[in-house]
């Protein structure tokens, strides 16, 4: 069973993603902020980390860099709704910084599962 860590400040979003992934056979852990997520990453060494780019405090770009520094082989899926920025541009930058794939919110469950599978296959 593949393990996934979801780092997002929106608890409802975390619950939805956890449900989708759990239903598809993934073991899921969530973190409501970047620091907690980075700690859990070190403890759990998950197969994939899903990181929201726009979070209060330490934002997702810095989180991706820190995860990549801790483990260059980590699989990372960047997600964002864009906020005040163009989501496509934000996600392109996230991929340049080390995300293996990216996904714009909102998304359909099938799109999430396809992105997760692409990241894990990379």
What are these regions (language model features)?
Residues 39, 61-73:
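Short amphipathic alpha-helix used as the core "switch/output" element in two-component signaling
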């Amino acid at each position: 069973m593949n393990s996934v860590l979801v780092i997002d400040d929106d608890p409802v979003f975390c619950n939805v993603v956890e449900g989708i992934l759990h239903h598809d056979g993934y073991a899921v852990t969530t973190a409501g902020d970047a620091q907690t997520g980075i700690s859990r990453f070190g403890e759990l060494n998950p197969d994939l980390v899903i990181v929201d780019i726009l979070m209060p405090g330490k934002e997702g770009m810095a989180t991706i860099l820190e995860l990549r520094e801790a483990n260059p082989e980590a699989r990372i899926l960047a997600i964002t709704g864009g906020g005040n920025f163009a989501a496509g541009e934000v996600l392109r930058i996230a991929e340049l910084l080390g995300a293996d794939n990216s996904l714009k919110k909102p998304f359909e469950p099938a799109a999430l599962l396809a992105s997760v599978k692409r990241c894990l296959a990379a």
